[in-house]
A protein has these predicted regions:
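Conserved glycine-rich cofactor-binding loop
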Residues: 15-16
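C-terminal substrate-recognition "lid" of short-chain dehydrogenase/reductases
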Residues: 123, 202-231, 236
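Conserved glycine-rich Rossmann-like NAD(P)H-binding loop of the short-chain dehydrogenase/reductase
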Residues: 29-44
């Protein structure tokens, strides 16, 4: 249905949360999925690889391993990310750099080794996992917001650069999603957040994964590039 059978896809941070949901959903629709992790591997995926996205050499090696063991990479999902929240007036350089290094530099490190290969083969798709915070901002997350907005800019530019080679680049931008991080938010705070969401609920990880499948597919997403798919329940349009 989605034309993903036997397509090789690399997902960064695919061992848990939204990343694991993406891995599982892509697999369900026939893709051969490799994913990176830093600590514990997840339950899904054909090829788990321990690699740190902040390290270009490790990501280059990961890409080589995927190509050797699974075949030519068709898609990359730049999902790995962290938070380190506080107000800008209290944020130290380490808090800023840690988030920039993982979320923004990590995305560059993940796609840089693959792009020339895709361009040579004249097919492929990059998907960046951004956030509603990158589209509208959020108090206490200036570092996180900056990186997630940056991913949108990367996708728009790569959409232009890759078009001549038949390589697409898009963004999935989740709103508040039922992840482990959100589950730890106090109920009173959750209630306040829910009031800002017209659909009055958080997204499920599976709903975000469906967005990735849609854009990754050469059938449903084949004429979509440089676009942002916002999955946020109407919180920001």
């Amino acid at each position: 249905m989605f034309g993903l059978k036997d397509k090789v896809v690399l997902v960064t941070g695919g061992n848990r949360g939204i990343g694991a949901a993406i891995v599982g959903k892509l697999e369900k629709h026939g893709a051969q999925v490799a994913y990176t992790y830093r600590s514990d591997p997840g339950a899904n995926g054909k090829l788990p690889i321990r690699a740190d996205v902040t390290n270009l050499a490790e990501m280059d090696a990961a890409v080589q391993q995927v190509e050797e063991e699974l075949g030519p990479i068709y898609g990359v999902v730049a999902n790995a990310g962290i938070t380190n929240d506080t107000l800008l007036s209290r944020m130290n350089p380490e808090q800023w750099e840690s988030v920039i290094s993982t979320n923004l530099n990590g995305a560059f490190n993940s796609i840089r080794p693959v792009a020339p290969l895709m361009y040579e083969r004249k097919e492929g798709c990059f998907i960046f996992i951004s956030s509603v915070v990158g589209e509208q901002g959020n108090i206490g997350q200036v570092n996180y917001s900056a990186t997630k907005a940056g991913l949108i800019g990367m996708a728009k530019t790569l959409g232009l650069e890759g078009a001549r080679y038949g390589v697409r680049a898009n963004v999935v931008s989740p709103g508040f999603t039922e992840t482990d991080m959100v589950r730890t938010i106090p109920d009173k705070v959750k209630e306040k957040i829910l009031k800002t969401i017209p659909l009055r609920r958080f997204a499920t990880e599976e709903e975000i994964a469906w967005g990735v499948v849609y854009l990754m597919s050469p059938v449903t997403g084949g004429y979509i590039t440089g676009a942002t798919l916002s999955i946020n329940g109407g919180r920001h349009t």
